[in-house]
Amino acid sequence: MRNPIPRVAAIHDLAGFARTSLTAAIPILSSMGIQATPLPTAILSTQTVGYNDFTLLDLTDDMVRILDHWERLGLRFDGVYSGFMASTAQMDSAARCIRNCLAPGGLAVVDPVLGDDGKLIPTMTPEMVAKMRWLITCADLITPNFTEVCLLLDEPYSPEADLPTLKGWLRRLARQWYIPLPGVFHAMQRKL
């Protein structure tokens, strides 16, 4: 029997001092009547943007054990949402969750958390950017910001890109995914 309350596996970090990640996702999903089921990637003292000396507890190994348990239970989710990843191995776990725990007809959403304002998040590496390009192929919907669009397409960060360039980038991404890009639309509006 199908659970009448929609369930979403939320694969993200838990930041102690922040208004982001699981701290935001759980109450937002809950307020929408969705059962948020966290699969934490890391525990951080603060969010990564704006703080240089944050602490990070990597939960890569725990993610594997949690997924093993969920699979033994036969859990299925109406949606799988992934955000901040602390390692490339975590991206493998996120793909595994999409592949093995997403109910037929469910929605896979990947927020490719890589950077902002033209800079990588301090914990990100070129290898993680390359792996994120692979992870987004598992998604139905991706939610990159402008910096992440540039990183995913291996294009130089150019906040002054002209309208034809921005449209071309969006077309390249939109061949495979639905992409709500508020930051890009604001940049495009400035060009109109």
Regions found by a protein language model. Give the residues of each.
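Conserved phosphate/ATP/ADP-binding segment of small-molecule kinases
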Residues: 123-192
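Conserved N-terminal subdomain of the carbohydrate kinase-like
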Residues: 2-110, 114-122
